[in-house]
Structure formats: C-alpha cells, structure tokens
Amino acid sequence: DGVEDIRALYRKSRYGSEEGSVAAATVASPTQTKTSKAKANDGVMTHSFGQHLPSWRDVMQPHPDVAEGRYRAAEFAADLAQVSRGEGVIEYRDPVEFFARTYVTEGMAGLLVESLQRISGQGGEPVIQLKTAFGGGKTHSMLALYHMVRGGIRVDHIPSLKPILERAGLQTLPKANVAVLVGTALDPTRKKNPANLPKYTVNTIWGEMAYQLVTSAGKPDLYAIVSDSDRRGVSPGSEALKTLLNSCGPCLILMDELVAYAKKIYGVDGL
C-alpha cells in the first residue's frame, strides 16, 4: 500500500490527478453525409464526405506528452528487465499509468484470465508460449501480467482490470512470487553474489530464477534446493524444480528474449 501511495502522489504531481494521465475523450458530433442521386434513371448514389469529416484531434485527444512534443520513441520500447529493476519511464513502471495507456485486446485478455485462474488454483494452463511476430505485443503482455500479480494494485484505480477479474471468476487479484528472465539483460559469464544469500553464488539462468523466487517469497534458505546444480552448471532435476516451485508458490516465471541468451552461450566453453 505504501508503494501505491507514493505512486499516487507522483501521478498527482505530474498529471494533476491521482488517477493519472487518462486522456479525456472528446466525442465529436456525428459525421454529416450529403447524399444525392446522380441521375434519375441509374440508381447510383453519390456521397460527399470531404468538408464534413472532422479532424482526428476533434475525435480523440492525444496524451499530453505527445501533444506537447515530449514523447521520445526510444523511451517507449517495452523492457521487462528494466521494469523489474524499478527503472525506466513511469508509464511502464506504474501499473495505473501502464494500464491507462494499454488497450487490452481479446488475445491479451485471454492470457490474463488464463494466468489468473492458474495462479488462484482454478485451472488454467501451467505453461503459455506467446507466439507473435516482432512488435506483436509479447513483452507488453508480460508486463501486464507482472503488474497484475505482484500485489499492491488497487483495482478501483484501473477500470480495465475489472472485466478481466469477472471473466476469471475472481473478486480480487491473486498475488504471486515473480521471476523475470530476459535474455538480453542476463550475462552468462558474470556470477552474482546476492547479499541475502551469503553462502551461495548464482551461476546459471536456473540459479537466477531460483534466486528471484526465494527472494520474492522471503525464503532465501530454499535456494539450497538448486544450489548444487547451479554450482555445477547444469539444470536442476524435475523433482528439485517441483519442490522449489511448490515451496515458493504460487509463482509466475516470465521469460523473454531467450534466443538472445542462447546466442551468448553458443560455442563458449564452460557455458
């Protein structure tokens, strides 16, 4: 709740309202169309739209940053790793701002509903592979999931989530422990010595996943489940992973740009 209070103060300072930058839609009057018969005997109708077509600015107002020329395209490439570190622009870090600028498509809604049902123990697919072309919204969809299940969201501030909850058969958002694995951000040659795991060194992507989950769950001692495998540079067995996930559950593991990670370790001895 404290984090959301700080976010609300930031939104009020930046946009003048705790509800954020939701643009007010100006509904233009219906477009007028002049219709006339070209000839009495051919039955052809001619339409004159031209001068009666309203400007797009009269139909929909752009966000203030776009209207004022403050929009920088480079800042708005979705970066899941950046958001998980608490970095990047507020429009991605703040759940209220993120969902205010996100149109929830039917495909995204289906993903969110399926995931919420799984996390809340109501079925749902345990593994979902997002298949879209470049720029198709995979990272954006994962960001939506990330914000939804980490806790601290006030649904009354995000109207677009209410239909999602209803479809999932839930009254409130379930909370999960989240691990974010982004191939472009991970460095397979660099080991990690987390302060909360003084006895261990994180060496592999499996170790990174376990480290994030046990940290989120507040159970750092559980890292011992995968520590031997991580130290030897091999993947944990299925029983070890099952024990880890059950002990830290419910869990959400988001994996993005794994091809980039595979390229880093291809042909490198010891990796």
Which ranges hold each PLM region?
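Generic recognition of flexible, low-complexity loop/linker segments
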Residues: 116-119, 166-169, 239-244, 249
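Conserved P-loop NTPase "ATPase switch" module shared by AAA+ and STAND
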Residues: 245-271
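Long, highly charged low-complexity segments enriched in Glu/Asp and Lys/Arg with interspersed Ser/Thr
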Residues: 2-23
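Walker A/P-loop-proximal flanking segment of P-loop NTPase domains
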Residues: 25-136, 143, 149
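P-loop NTPase motor core
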Residues: 99, 128-133, 140-239
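Short loop/turn elements that form and flank the Walker-type P-loop nucleotide-binding site
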Residues: 123-124, 174-175, 247-249
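Structural motif corresponding to the C-terminal cap of alpha-helices
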Residues: 115-123, 153, 213, 217, ...
